[in-house]
Design a protein with these regions (language model features):
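Terminal targeting signals and extreme-terminal segments of soluble enzymes
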Residues: 1-126
């Protein structure tokens, strides 16, 4: 799975409304418009959505490699810095290290130029 069309076809990303703006190894950029059906009881973008975006950005960066056929997230960490109450969310993912069947990546999530969250993850490649 390494073509842009295959990445876009992800049912989960479709459900969230994610737009894959760029996916060229070792980087990706995803976009998501804030919507009421993605918020928590306080009216801000749900933390699980943010974690999903962080994971998806790094996953798209990895899967855009010709050599990577599939991935499994083995660890995911997200640091949250501020709430998202409206606007367009941009996530930039990057593969930082890849060796053998393991890869590590980072992603930065922004809303209107403000850093909202920073995430890192480890992946098993196959």
């Amino acid at each position: 799975m390494n073509t842009r069309r295959e990445l876009i076809a992800s049912p989960y990303l479709k459900l969230l409304g994610v737009i894959i703006d760029e996916a060229k190894y070792p980087r990706s950029r995803l976009l998501l418009a804030w919507r009421e059906n993605l918020v928590n009881p306080m009216g801000t973008l749900h933390g699980g959505v943010i974690a999903s975006l962080v994971d998806a950005a790094m996953g798209c960066a990895l899967l855009s490699s010709e050599e990577v056929k599939g991935i499994v997230t083995t660890e995911l960490k997200v640091n949250y810095f501020r709430a998202v109450t409206s606007g367009i969310v941009k996530v930039e993912g990057e593969v930082i290290h890849r060796q053998g069947s393991v890869a590590f990546g980072q992603a930065y999530l922004y809303c209107e130029e403000d850093l909202v969250a920073l995430g890192s993850a480890t992946y098993k490649l196959y």
